[in-house]
Amino acid sequence: MSTQSVIAVKQFSGPDKIAQAYTVPQPSAHVLSNANYDYDLCGSTNSTSLSCAIQSSNIKTESISSSSLPKILPFSTDSNGESSLSRMSQAEFSDPILSSSSTFCTSLYTSSPMNSGSCRKTGYLPFLPQPPKCEQQQNSVGQSSSSLMLLDADLRNSGHADDEHTDDLKDFLNLSSDCSFHGKCSAMAYNEQMEFQFLSEQLGIAISNNEESPRLDDIYDRPPQLMSLPVSSCSDQEDLQDARSPAKVQLSSSRSSSGTASCNKPRLRWTPELHERFVDAVNKLEGPEKATPKGVLKLMKVEGLTIYHIKSHLQKYRLAKYLPETKEDKKQEEKKTKSVANGNDHAKKKSAQMAEALRMQMEVQKQLHEQLEVQRQLQLRIEEHARYLQKILEEQQKARESISSMTSTTEGESPEFAPMEKTEDKAETSSAPLSKCRITDTDAECHSKVDNKKTKPQADLEMVHDE
């Protein structure tokens, strides 16, 4: 179980030195039980601490002001994904205190001698603050050699307590089993790595190669080789080679290989023989619809053939089987559309022919109507001419009656004029048949003209009907 705790930094001001105390979170599965004690980096004075202080008298301790204290940032996040800020407490003491249990200089990342009794009492580990900048590294070369000698003596004398302490340190920092301190100037790299870790906890982004979430290395365009960073004191390489063989401390940057690894499927070439065996197996399983990849694989019994190959090939086989049917359906639909189009064209032609016939019929009817109109006009003229002739005949008849009456009166009055009247009557009678003959001739001519006019429209009608 991971517990959330507060890291406190105590500042002990003195004339030349400053003491710091840290409270760090409990490890998850170890015996670090007392959570309320402070691990005093510059512990109580005793004989061993005085001797250690005498040996390390040449070390130049840097005075740290309250403004230049290392930034203490949390390592544990709450349920909402937001990192809990650590609170820093400062306490000033008038007397300077020498470091006995674990001297922690600002330019070093090594732990000095630790009392086993105090370690068992407190049960806490030191916290690694931010390293100094590269400008301070050059001034700390003289300090590194003496601190390395102290580190060697402490590691030899600590015993089982140091082993427990190093195990707890590994578990707290999530270090590998073969971690130790290597002498190489990597303060800037470590500082950047810690900043990336804190940013990742604040933003909820893991510094990992997981495919689901982006990496901070990718966001800030950092090379992926920063997974392991050596943490050591800034010392000369020659002194480190003389002291002991170096081993790198690899910080766990939470590179999880939990991403889904794509399984490399071996490619298979479907030869005609293999396809024939596949088709036989599918036919035995009552067609591609009812065939299953597992059953086809059992029936084929081919080495190197997997169910993934069968699945893909069966899907392609089904698609290829349905494609010709769809092509035939398309051809039938095209034929139907062509037949429908032909039928429509034939109907259009028929309708055009009918329209043309109706138009011709309308023209013929129009011509007949004109001919009938001409015949009616002729008939009216004939009737007028007949009335005119009738009037002439009536006038002639009246004239005859008047003449006959006049002759009868004259005969009774003067018999002398009787032969003359007779001769006049004879002349009149002789002229009367001549006029009658003339009238009959004119009537005959009129009737013949009317008959000719009547026969012409009848002949035209007969010609139209014949057409």
From Swiss-Prot:
Coiled coil, from the record: none
Domain HTH myb-type: 262-322
InterPro entries noted in UniProt: Homeodomain-like_sf (IPR009057), Myb_CC_LHEQLE (IPR025756), Myb_dom (IPR017930), Myb_dom_plants (IPR006447), PHR1-like (IPR046955), SANT/Myb (IPR001005)
GO molecular function: DNA binding; DNA-binding transcription factor activity
Keywords: DNA-binding, Nucleus, Transcription, Transcription regulation
Main subcellular location of this protein, as a coarse class: nucleus
DNA-binding region location: 293-318
Positions of the UniProt region annotated as Disordered: 227-266, 327-353, 400-467
Localisation: Nucleus
Bias (Polar residues) ranges: 402-412
Compositionally biased residues, Basic and acidic residues: 327-337, 419-428, 438-467
Entry keyword DNA-binding: yes
Primary role: Transcription factor involved in phosphate starvation signaling. Binds to P1BS, an imperfect palindromic sequence 5'-GNATATNC-3', to promote the expression of inorganic phosphate (Pi) starvation-responsive genes. Functionally redundant with PHR1 and PHR2 in regulating Pi starvation response and Pi homeostasis.
PANTHER family: HTH MYB-TYPE DOMAIN-CONTAINING PROTEIN (PTHR31499:SF79), MYB FAMILY TRANSCRIPTION FACTOR PHL11 (PTHR31499)
Protein name, entry field: Protein PHOSPHATE STARVATION RESPONSE 3
Naturally occurring in which organism (per UniProt): Oryza sativa subsp. indica
Gene giving rise to this polypeptide: PHR3
